[in-house]
């Protein structure tokens, strides 16, 4: 039986911007299914998920993938956060999403991701004039062509 490093990963309770947290459990391998990964506890008072006098929270594995850094049989384990009584923690927004997806499983989900970023040339965004601002975005929003879009060679 091999030993597997399972990196349990969860979202903390900080607001307005939550952070990722993780800790490693050594489990007997190989891990063949989600049920091979046990629930695990953590101190929620250190992650803004519980008060200091009642700080127990639980990590419930919901998905795992091979660990690209440690390799071999080691894993990254995505977890939901539960209260000590196994109810859904208020910071666990995934649980509500799963409930909605289950309730509306007969409908097709559509979503889009728009990755926004800005390249800089010195103190100005790439392609901006040295003084002031460019013309209104109409010409270059979702634009095509070297006269409208800058930095394409980096993006591609």
Q: PLM features: residue spans?
A:
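Glycine-rich, acidic/polar active-site loops that bind/position phosphate-bearing ligands
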Residues: 1-156
